Amino acid sequence: MKRILVVTALAVVGLAAGAQADERALDLAIGDLARKDREMPIVLDGITEAAEGALLTPPELAERLDDVQVLFVGESHTDMEFHRVQLRVIQELHRRGRTVIVGLEMYPAAAQEWLDRWISDETLTEEGFLDESHWYRSWGYNWEYYRDIFVFARENGLRMVGVNVPRDVVQTVRREGFEGLSEEQRALLPERVDTDSAEHQQLFRAFFGDEDSLHGNMPPALFEGMFRAQCTW
């Protein structure tokens, strides 16, 4: 039985300053050279396969993912529809017999003890889990957006893992760069964090519109620090 790590959440989506910024970020000519200038209609409640434009059912999507070991499922943090899609993907992969591991952006690896307890300890209440795992300090978004995913994982024995680094590492990278990290902090990161992608920078900047008084005209040094932090996160 093949394992698949489903990583929920992509933080940059939550940085959008408004509708105009959202539209700019969704209309950038970036990515695969063969497709970056193409547009395709999106069908309500449908799954559009971008390479060929085919419409897929959820079971067909799960079948196409048979050889995939790591799957990223993005979100807008406060939009429930994104979380329903994440749950449906996890459900279909589980239904297909995959060993699904749910990777969580909101938790660092150091929180693994509480994620393991959430799955294995029936006496741990939701309130106890949120308190002991520091949900609102680590993440801050309403638990109800994510509750169905956590409950499904618990009821079906799916492992959940924290895939992020501690916030102090991200904050140091933002303020001082990678050279400001201690040896202990550096050991928590991969050998290289890619901050050189021009298209990633273009996408990141698109989320900050001119109408965003806080971020729209930020100095280059501030943008670079935020971008480094985003890449590290």
Predicted regions and their residues:
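A substrate-binding/cap region within the structured catalytic cores of diverse enzymes
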Residues: 101, 113-233
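Sec-dependent signal peptide recognition
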Residues: 2-8
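Membrane-embedded segments
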Residues: 77-103, 109-121
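Acidic/histidine-rich, surface-exposed loop or edge segments in extracytoplasmic proteins
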Residues: 41-44, 66-74, 128-133
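Soluble non-cytosolic domains of exported or imported proteins
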Residues: 38, 55, 76-84, 140-147, ...
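N- or domain-start disorder-to-order transition segments that initiate the globular core
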Residues: 21-68
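Zymogen propeptides
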Residues: 53-95
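Hydrophobic h-region of N-terminal signal peptides that target proteins for export
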Residues: 10-18
